[in-house]
Amino acid sequence: MRDYIDAVSNQIKFLVARFCVKEFSSVYIGGGTPSILDEQDLSALCASIKSSVDAFSEAVEFTIEANPETVSEGFLEAAQSGGVNRLSLGIQCADDGVLKSVGRRTSRAQILEAVRLIKKNWRGQWCADFIAGLPFQTKAMLRDDLDFAFQNGAAHISLYALSLEEGTPLAKNVAAGVAEYDADFADELWLLGREILEGFGFSHYEISNFTIPGHESKHNGGYWHLRDYLGAGAGAVGTIWMGNGNPALKENPAQKKGVRFANTHDIRKYVNFWKEFEWRHGEEIPRLPCELEAIDLQTEEKEFLMMGFRTSVGVGENEYRARFGKDLAERLGAESGAFGRWRKKNLAHVTEKNGEVFYSLTREGLLFLNRFLIEI
């Protein structure tokens, strides 16, 4: 495992140098299951992240994901000592039968113990992930799960409606009659979950995310608003957008494209390349073990709108104009086009905040996001 940590650390150093990064606005250690790292490896990874930039503020949102069965006092202490201040716990559902039906390794007892340890030892914010519509899940189960997380201090909850993806174990089990899936009931459960969370005082600030005001995810917010992000580790993805003006992209102004890179999923190949890697700015870059995608401004604009309309705030008129040199109202058809039609149906609206005009979907309109994106 130490070879892998060294490889990740070296890639971070390379990316920071290549894209002229001076500081991080947020850090997210995801997975995979980073909570399986032993305390020494986790400490080494955190130290490497913090030392890779010129300045690392302790106030930076620093998140780590964890599965309940891997949470321990040692893990929590190592994470906190390393600067992590936000813990995301993947609960999904706290019923043993439901968990077994989707092949989860965790159990209800392990979930309860993980939350007990978090309440006892964790000084930062903790968040929980749930899924609505799992096989054999009931309304009572979802209600109890959300209440459990809220009563134990989770200030941010992600709630996803289950959708079957072809080729997954769950899809195969459903096809074989071993598990059940009802898309309509999944949507019904999700709507119930939204009602419950809003009753607790949570704000529905993104299509699948709810928060006690003031505890929004800064890392996810950057992703939704097309901020640049680096991805290090096997299978990780990073994107540097043209519209953010990164100096590295200006080296070839004729190209006028951003870049997205997806690291190889082959862990051995990843480690063999990166564990001894060294590079200094100005040196020729060797062929990297990743797939590269050039992103033109048309694609960037499409993704900007797609991600922005996922949020309750929506897309800002001034930000859009500064980034793409276009009028947002005209692009969306605010008067007689697609946005105008949705607005007449009370599925979209225009709001103003701090002098900025925002175009967004209403609470009801967010339920039909995919249809809206097709129409615009």
Where are these regions (language model features)?
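Short, amphipathic alpha-helical interaction segments positioned at domain boundaries
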Residues: 363-376
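Short amphipathic alpha-helical interaction segments
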Residues: 327-344
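Minor-groove-contacting beta-hairpin "wing" of winged helix-turn-helix DNA-binding domains
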Residues: 355-362
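Short active-site-adjacent structural elements
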Residues: 317, 350, 369
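C-terminal scaffold of the Radical SAM
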Residues: 1-18, 22-329
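A short, conserved structural fragment
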Residues: 343-354
